[in-house]
Regions:
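Catalytic cores of nucleotide-sugar-dependent glycosyltransferases that transfer UDP/GDP/TDP-activated
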Residues: 1-152
Length: 152
């Protein structure tokens, strides 16, 4: 039997429902956040969408930058050309959260979709409904994850 247990230096989880209750995924995320914080010594960061232009944040979001995000928020986030708000999720375990505003990516949508088609064969012209919103949030979340992983 293999006793391997991965111990990542940082665990990142992204979802449309981080600090944005829409359905059942929110319940799944909040119900296990405390246990994940314990198991990973607080080295987990949740990434969700920033859906407001004002300082009117979700009621379950604490707008105080957690220690694990202070340096990244100060040094790296400003260079990414996206608006970020760092804080904690008001749920058991109070996990750190990065909310990312993906709206600026709409200006680059055609280029981003072309790159997805060219590299991965994704036919974005077949998307409908909230395709753009979900896709652009996914790209913004991936950029955020990359930055967090590359940050010293």
């Amino acid at each position: 039997m293999n006793d391997f247990r991965p111990n990542p230096s940082l665990l990142l989880e992204t979802s449309w429902e981080v600090c944005n209750k829409q359905g059942g995924i929110y319940t799944v995320l909040t119900s296990r956040a405390h246990e994940m914080m314990k198991r990973h010594d607080g080295r987990i960061i949740f990434i969700g969408p920033l859906l407001t232009e004002q300082e009117d944040f979700p009621t379950d979001f604490e707008n105080t930058v957690p220690a694990i995000l202070e340096d990244w928020h100060r040094d790296a986030a400003p260079s990414l050309d996206l608006r970020y708000v760092c804080g904690s999720w008001r749920t058991p375990g109070s996990p750190p959260v990065v909310l990312v505003d993906f709206e600026p990516l709409y200006a680059q949508k055609a280029t981003l979709y072309y790159e997805m088609w060219e590299h991965f064969g994704i036919q974005s012209d077949k998307g409908y409904g909230d395709y753009d919103e979900a896709s652009l949030f996914g790209i913004a979340a991936a950029q955020t994850m990359h930055s967090l992983c590359e940050y010293p």
